[in-house]
Amino acid sequence: MEPMLGDRDGFRFRGGSLALDFTATLAARKREQTRELLETPRDLARWFAAAGLAVHKVNVTEDDLAAARALREALYRLALARVGGAPLPAADRRLLNRHAALATPAPRLDAAGVHWSRAETPALLAVIARAGVELLGGPLADRVRQCSGRWCAILFVDMSRSGHRKWCSMSGCGNKAKVATFRERNRTE
């Protein structure tokens, strides 16, 4: 599945990977108080739709929501381990692999493009988990980065030619950093 960058329905899609975009559903990770974007089962159903995984309404239970949050946090810790060059936590690998082993919905092509067959939450979480396995265990694993923005913890795949991208979004965090540097430079002159 090709990543769609940007913000949709209150969710940020800046990671360049479905798995990394899913980790952004817990916002403000670098602040004292995080902001949970998946507060209710309905929020998870909205995220599936915003991510392009579900065309039809998905029935999400409280148990599904708990499983989704656990998968999200495992993905986040695994990606941070990749960023830091640390070993991948075994418990998180087991959780990710357990989700990735589940059956996934089948993509189908129609006149408007690719759509996913109707699926339940575990199958959609399997799609996210497989994206995580492929990213964190594949050739782009060394291109996973964390935004250098002061308060931003978004993870992304650095697809820049040089491999030195610093921010999740040049128009957001990148611009803020450049403005702060400019102001600091002018203050000291």
Regions found by a protein language model. Give the residues of each.
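Short helix-coil boundary/hinge micro-motifs
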Residues: M1-Q146, A153-I154
